[in-house]
From Swiss-Prot:
EC numbers: 1.1.1.267
Pathway(s) the chain acts in: Isoprenoid biosynthesis; isopentenyl diphosphate biosynthesis via DXP pathway; isopentenyl diphosphate from 1-deoxy-D-xylulose 5-phosphate: step 1/6
Cited function: Catalyzes the NADPH-dependent rearrangement and reduction of 1-deoxy-D-xylulose-5-phosphate (DXP) to 2-C-methyl-D-erythritol 4-phosphate (MEP).
Gene transcribed to yield this protein: dxr
Provenance organism: Elusimicrobium minutum (strain Pei191)
UniProt KW keywords: Isoprene biosynthesis, Manganese, Metal-binding, NADP, Oxidoreductase
Family matches, as Gene3D superfamilies: 1.10.1740.10, NAD(P)-binding Rossmann-like Domain
Main EC class the enzyme belongs to: oxidoreductase
Protein name, per record: 1-deoxy-D-xylulose 5-phosphate reductoisomerase
Amino acid sequence: MKNIVVLGSTGSIGVSSLDVIDKLGAGYGVLALSANTNADLLIKQMLKFKPRFVAVLNEDSYQKVKPYVPENTKLLPPDEDSLIFLASLPSADLIINGLVGAVGFMPLVTAIKNGKTIALANKEPIVMAGKSIMEECYRWKATILPVDSEPSAIFQCLQGTPAGRKEEDISRLLLTASGGPFFKYKGALSRVKPEAALAHPRWVMGKKITIDSATLMNKGFETIEIMHLFNVSLSDIEIVIHPQSIIHSAVEFKDGSILAQLSQPDMRLPIQYAVTYPNRMPSPVKKLTVKDMAKLEFAAPDFKKFPCLELALWSAQKEGAFPAVLSAADEIAVDAYLKEKILFTDIPKLIYSVLKETRSPSGKITISEAAEFDVWAREKAREFLANKKYKKTII
């Protein structure tokens, strides 16, 4: 039996993960669940999967869940220490980190220090302190299995390459992006409302990552993530807009050969690969047909139209604290946009305003430094929101 902890079980990744586990059936069990505010869904999940542990971070949701806890399930206190506890459970064989934003940082670090295998959808911790986190992975013999479709595609394409030769054999990583809902949009992006930005043409995801996909910040985050997961430089990665989301990414090797991973755009497939790794099992995901692949489009990203991507690549090149600041400022900006406090086009302005104020050490930063810069950047972003200084920013 593979015992699985699902952090963020009521979010998009968590719901898909539980669907995968349910359909796999025998041999896969849910050891623990965590959620924040969606008490109703958590209650349903808890009663169906009967986990040994449940964590609810939000106090009101905690009180709502409490009467429904099964006899053999332990409800943990409503705080982030409970996430740390779940990430370090000795009996956990796999930790699925489907948390959103920096809240997943310390649970990831904890799981790594306990030598766990982590199915990682929460890319922000790698963005914040990728070099230090990967060093901890090697030190504690932990394993990170990428769950996002594009990093998972690259991971799968590299499975036939001997571990010691991966970096030596790679010529280029082709990182695909759908382009989001505004790839061909001709109108003024400043007028775009959250409901339009949340209408992703290919993927069903949580609100934060869907807005990041609309601004292309998500692709910038994935670029930074891929640099660290596969130990490649920024110059080794080429971002390609591919609206159909059939080719999830590709690897070009030194001899000119290109291996790509193709499938329907359904997050259950990369999740299942991480859950069953290194094995493959039958999946409920619809199979590709030749007709599906008849018309595949490709284009270069438009950095002028989507400045968030350029900010992310700039931060990746600068290294130090800049990626951590980028991640934190983006989280504040996206939240403000979803609450209609700022315009869609204000998102990169607010992020850039915070990046300009950053005084970063050169090179690698430690895990504790990343956490400190995360706090600082959030405070600075909120300050700019309050005084509206970001409005005058020209990118």
